[in-house]
Amino acid sequence: MKPWNNRSDIEAALFNPAYCGELILHAVKAYNRNSTHGKFPYALSYLILPFLLNTELYESLPATKRTKLITWLYGNRFLTPTIADKAKSLKEYTNEALLLYLSMELLRINDLTELDLGSVKMVRKHNFQRSEVEEKLKRAEFLGSWLSEAGDIVTIYSLIGITI
């Protein structure tokens, strides 16, 4: 991971650990609210930033959960390598965000390597008023909810072409 003084202003803003952590937290919250088969798998956190921070992936996400992941992947086969590549290239930023949010107890991880909301509740004064940040947070919730219906982590990674 690059030291902060070696990051460009754009890189520091876009991959700010607090911002990335907030995106992951919103996905975790929605996943856990909608899942019938357990909490948010830790390994799934590596897909959140690629879907939300890559313009091509972000803009191709379905509007509703009625489009299942497997159907979306079939219709967007050309994007499958992008997802795997972005997951790999954004791994360090995901790690940095998770480390921050776990250390602040905004997220917690259990013995099954599942993520849940932590014991600390941060007062969030989002006053974005339809800004891109607010839209990203809503799409993070959509993504968490959508992935909660996509099957287990092995199935999801296999569909995307990521090997564990």
Regions found by a protein language model. Give the residues of each.
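Basic amphipathic alpha-helical segments that dock to polyanions
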Residues: 96-108
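A glycine-rich, hydrophobic loop/mini-helix early in the fold
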Residues: 40-74
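Helix-adjacent hinge/juxtasegments
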Residues: 70-93
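Glycine-rich, aromatic-bearing surface loops/beta-hairpins
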Residues: 125-164
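Generic structural signal for hydrophobic core residues of well-folded globular domains
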Residues: 27-32, 51-55, 101, 147-150, ...
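Short, extreme N-terminal leader segments that mark the start of a protein/domain
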Residues: 1-19, 149-164
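Long, hydrophobic N-terminal alpha-helical segment
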Residues: 3-52
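Minor-groove-contacting beta-hairpin "wing" of winged helix-turn-helix DNA-binding domains
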Residues: 113-119
